[in-house]
């Protein structure tokens, strides 16, 4: 027999302990959850969504999706509660207004339009049917034709050195207006000089009086251009100064939007030849037709096609069927429109959760364990799970106090964001080509990250439900009386920061922050552990009952032992008696057979003797 190795039992116990520890770590308390809707259920809702979408035309995929969400919202779950959720980077686009932010524009022909190259932007396009709402005048442009609520773009606008598409009196009746203008842009020099070179030296400066265009002569919206104006007879008086656009009294001045309009059509520029005639400007040549390309960076996009825009109750309804969603344009057909849209950094949406709201899984687990231990029916699995939850509580107590989990998660979000932005914008490969292009790409990334940092900053200030990692379910309950679904719907369709029509995001954010800043119940680790241990040990029997249990168990063991040891003897005795009885029966049977045979022989002998005595 082989000898047992030293430490064999110790190693076996260690393996068993590790196995038990692994099993306990995998144990969880599962609550009954409602199943997700099946594909047939969603398909059954589609006809209702289609009917709802027809109530308020036009019918677009976005409108049908919102109607489907509306129908799903009406399907109430008795055990569910609605909370406001913060959803970053939603997969939707919204119309951009004139009073929100400056739109950066990059071009491929910097010798014609100056500025920064679009080499770091990869042109993309896809078909789309778009429907959106906005309370601001939309950034819509129509090429060589008037269109309701769009700004007409004309061809062949003359500058001292170039001829490009842009804004002139065909946009609307021109007048002059006084105002403050963009304070961060200097005034233009009175002494304008014209020099001919390879590149066009555009100089950004403003005039003291703006050119004001009455858009479509409707006397409702006015386009202001703060660049120095000129006359058709003397275009050089205008100077090589790019337009500076603003609408009405909006404090945002678009300094690069003119390059996007220049890409609607063709252009040409002057170039220097040897001065033979001795004229003022020398011998100047004119290039052939040039077709520049203009691009906007993420998160801005362009929708090109035939747009329908209507104004109802101070709300602009934008509809475009079978249009093109793109980030670059190079030529626009006469009569087509182009609008500028943007992906919002976030949206606020009410969502329903079936479980209770909590921001730390370990604390919620401990609470459920304490509740389960206090119930009449308890089990060993709950006791073991309670020990595991206590260990988890110790490991995450600091996390609950300083929100370390949220900080780490935000770091992963920023890292993933940086990777995705670099990948989508295509800057990783093209960023090293030119210093200027590298700075342009870096500027775009920084601007996008700036918006994301603002979103993350708000995300870091609030606590979120622990079960949802890609959205933030806040503590703020959703109240249909304060925020009807119609306002939520308009918020998703593009109306922001309008208390009367859509969600008042500032008020909603302040209410959420008030909840976060309110005094919170501190976690007393000692009291929590004492309470947990009391509930835990209350499941074990007392000493008196344990003694009775041990006595009864001993008696039961003795009875079992007696039965185990006596039963074989009894069985063996019964078997022996049975075998002895059987032997005796066989012996008696055998003896009876012998007696019967002996008697038969006597009878035969007697018969033989009687037969011999007869004469």
Swiss-Prot record:
Region (Required for cell transformation): 590-593
Residues listed as glycosylation sites in the UniProt record: 108, 127, 178, 219, 275, 319
Pfam family, one: GP41
GO biological process terms held by the UniProt record: entry receptor-mediated virion attachment to host cell; fusion of virus membrane with host plasma membrane; symbiont entry into host cell; viral process
Any one GO molecular function term: structural molecule activity
Keywords: Cleavage on pair of basic residues, Coiled coil, Fusion of virus membrane with host cell membrane, Fusion of virus membrane with host membrane, Glycoprotein, Host-virus interaction, Membrane, Oncogene, Signal, Transmembrane, Transmembrane helix, Viral attachment to host cell, Viral attachment to host entry receptor, Viral envelope protein, Viral penetration into host cytoplasm, Virion, Virus entry into host cell
Cytoplasmic side: 403-615
GO cellular component: membrane; viral envelope; virion membrane
Residues annotated as transmembrane: 379-402
Signal peptide: 1-84
Coiled-coil annotated spans: 411-461, 495-531
Extracellular side of membrane: 85-378
Organism domain of life: Viruses
Entry text on domains: Both SU and TM seem to be involved in efficient transformation. The cytoplasmic tail of TM is necessary for the transformation.
Biological role: The envelope proteins induce cell transformation leading to ovine pulmonary adenocarcinoma (OPA), a contagious lung cancer of sheep and goat. They bind to the HYAL2 receptor for cell entry. Env proteins probably do not act as oncogenes by themselves, but may rather liberate an oncogenic factor that would normally be negatively regulated.
PANTHER family, per database record: ENDOGENOUS RETROVIRUS GROUP K MEMBER 113 ENV POLYPROTEIN-RELATED, ENDOGENOUS RETROVIRUS GROUP K MEMBER 21 ENV POLYPROTEIN-LIKE
Record's subunit section: Interacts with sheep HYAL2 receptor.
Protein's UniProt name: Envelope glycoprotein
Annotated organism of origin: Sheep pulmonary adenomatosis virus (Jaagsiekte sheep retrovirus)
UniProt lineage: Viruses, Riboviria, Pararnavirae, Artverviricota, Revtraviricetes
